Amino acid sequence: MKVILQKDVKDVGRVGELVNVSEGFARNFLFPRKLAAEATEKRVKEYEHLQRVAEAKKKKALAERQELLNKINGTTVTFKLAAGDTDKLFGTVTTTDISKELQKMGHSIDRRDIHLEEPIKVLGQHKAVVRYAEGMEAKIQIAVERA
C-alpha cells in the first residue's frame, strides 16, 4: 500500500515521502498515529506539486548563495586590535567577529559557514574560506592591524 508520510518514521522514511508499506502496518500503526495518509490520486498530485515547488525554492536559494559568494570572493576584512610588543593579539579574531564585520559590509554570512585555517592570534594577513556546500566557496582575506 502506498502512503505519504506526514511525520518522520524510523526505518520507513521522512516527512512528505511517498513510500510503499504493508497494508497492516499502514492501517494498524501509521494511520491511527497520524504518521501517514493513504496515497490517493489527489494526494499524489498534491505531493508531486509540493516536490516541484520545494525543488524550485532550493535552486533559487543555491543561486542566491552562489551570487553572494561571487560578491565576497577576494574581499578583505580589516580589524584594528590591541596587540603586545611581539605582535600577539590581546584576544582572538573569531568567525563570529568576521561574520559581524561582513554584516556591516552588507553581506549576511553565518559564522558556521566561515572556516579558518587556524585561530587568528597575531597581527598580519590571514585567509578564511566561506563555504556553503561542496564546491560553493569564496576565499576572503583577514587583515589584522594594530589599533
UniProtKB/Swiss-Prot annotation:
GO terms for cellular component: ribonucleoprotein complex; ribosome. The keyword rRNA-binding applies. The keyword Lipid biosynthesis does not apply. It comes from the Bacteria. PROSITE patterns: RIBOSOMAL_L9. GO terms for molecular function: rRNA binding; structural constituent of ribosome. Gene3D superfamilies: Ribosomal protein L9, C-terminal domain, Ribosomal protein L9, N-terminal domain. It holds the Pfam family Ribosomal_L9_N. Keywords: Ribonucleoprotein, Ribosomal protein, RNA-binding, rRNA-binding. InterPro entries: Ribosomal_bL9, Ribosomal_bL9/RNase_H1_N, Ribosomal_bL9_bac/chp, Ribosomal_bL9_C, Ribosomal_bL9_C_sf, Ribosomal_bL9_N, Ribosomal_bL9_N_sf. GO terms for biological process: translation. Belongs to the bacterial ribosomal protein bL9 family. Binds to the 23S rRNA. This is Large ribosomal subunit protein bL9. It comes from Bdellovibrio bacteriovorus (strain ATCC 15356 / DSM 50701 / NCIMB 9529 / HD100). The lineage of its organism: Bacteria, Pseudomonadati, Bdellovibrionota, Bdellovibrionia, Bdellovibrionales.
